[in-house]
Amino acid sequence: MEMDDESQLVLKAQEGNVEAFMILAKKYEQPVFRLLYRLTKNREDAADLTQETMLKAFRAIKEFKLKSSFNTWLHRIAVNLALNFIKKHQNQKSQMEYLDNLKNEEQEVPVFSSPEEVSISEEFRINLEKAIEELPLAYRTTFSLIVFQGMSHQEAARILGCSENTVSWRMHEARKMLKERLKPFLNLKQEV
């Protein structure tokens, strides 16, 4: 869908055309779900928040100004809902589900020469996922938008309502925290 087509759909949706909005919602449903899943760490919560995001966007579409992309606006709604949800449920520990929707779902399966390498690779994946989940919320949100949603620092800054410098700093700190958290594993991997 080209940007002009998307703008036309937004304008039609603003005029009350439900079908136009449904086309937009269908296009962005999965990226929004993946982001919300990374933030909430729970499929059911992510699915509920995705629905809530689409409903809120539908109700507010007339207020949307075409100053930013529909994608940026929709992700901003999703992030705000997720942050409110997380704050509300901060004291409740939901069971952790391991992430299986990585950025590149069609990644090639690596070829390992030994069972030890398979075990180490699986251990690394689990440790990486856990390390990402343990990042402070602001860093995890920024990291998820850029790494898993493929957004630029500028787009992430618009969604998060902060400066590009803040986004860059959060990415720097998130990478530093991940590297520190994974340091024992990285040393082990180099020894094999």
Q: Where do the model's predicted regions map?
A:
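C-terminal edge and immediately downstream basic/flexible tail or linker adjoining helix-turn-helix-like DNA-binding
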Residues: 1-3, 12, 94-100, 127, ...
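N-terminal module of bacterial RNA polymerase sigma factors
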Residues: 1-31, 116-117, 180, 184, ...
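Internal acidic/polar
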Residues: 3, 92-118
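Amphipathic alpha-helical segment used for protein-protein interaction
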Residues: 11, 15, 90, 111-144, ...
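Sigma70-family region 2
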Residues: 14-15, 41, 54-69, 88-90
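Short, charged helix-capping/linker segments at alpha-helix termini
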Residues: 14-23, 33-52, 164, 186-191
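Arg/Lys-rich amphipathic alpha helix in sigma70-family domain 2
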Residues: 62-65, 76-97, 173, 184
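DNA-recognition helix of helix-turn-helix
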Residues: 72, 83, 139, 145-148, ...
